[in-house]
UniProtKB/Swiss-Prot annotation:
Gene: BIM3
Quaternary state and interactors: Homodimer. Interacts with the N-terminus of BZR2/BES1.
Subcellular location: Nucleus
CC per GO annotation: nucleus
SUPFAM superfamilies noted in UniProt: HLH, helix-loop-helix DNA-binding domain (SSF47459)
Gene Ontology biological-process entries: DNA-templated transcription; regulation of DNA-templated transcription
Protein name (database record): Transcription factor BIM3
Function: Positive brassinosteroid-signaling protein.
Listed Basic and acidic residues bias regions: 37-46, 288-298
Amino acid sequence: MNSHDIDDQLEADVYSNLPSRNDSSTGRRNRNSCRSKHSETEQRRRSKINERFQSLMDIIPQNQNDQKRDKASFLLEVIEYIHFLQEKVHMYEDSHQMWYQSPTKLIPWRNSHGSVAEENDHPQIVKSFSSNDKVAASSGFLLDTYNSVNPDIDSAVSTKIPEHSPVSAVSSYLRTEPSLQFVQHDFWQPKTSCGTINCFTNELLTSDEKTSASLSTVCSQRVLNTLTEALKSSGVNMSETMISVQLSLRKREDREYSVAAFASEDNGNSIADEEGDSPTETRSFCNDIDHSQKRIRR
């Protein structure tokens, strides 16, 4: 090989190693595609951030004149608004701390052997919850309902309600006092115009278990309705609350009281002569009382 052939070969190799136009265009396309992908990712990221900021701006109240704000100042406003909401929550919890008090701190239940003025103090047990007047009023009605029944009521109130609610505190206190005694109602007081005899309470209640069961059912339903209304008025969600009330009536053997009894026809005539009434009116009056007593005995 001569020197001329060697030079031609070297020149051909140099030209073959030089980049062509097609190669340069392909490289440009690759660089442009990488840049476009990067810009699309960045654009999606920025759009998500802007959407989140816009949702925050919609939640937090702002002035209409303050439409243009930088993100740092807006984030500071978000933090301040969160602190404001926390203060509100703390104020609400402080005002309702009485639901968390233990039942032992309540006023003890008074005995029913006192005067009527002492009986009026019963609603104070629930009135200690001073922030909820509706519950206090409804609990006073519950006590009036209990006092309308003469025999002892062994109440077992089983509730499934949220913790720290006002009714849970009252029901737990009632469970700690199972042997509550109530005032004898005026309906059971004797009528002096027909004479009186002393008898025990077990003479009023018959041995028929159906009668006592029906009376217990009526009283339980009445207390349950009142308790449900009290819960609704106090704001308790009844769809998440399950309440059951069961009252059991029992006879009493430790106390006597007077019950109106029959008077003889001669006694009726003497009473009629003293009061200026006819014997027929006196007998009819005694018969009415006897009829009412028979209805009670049933």
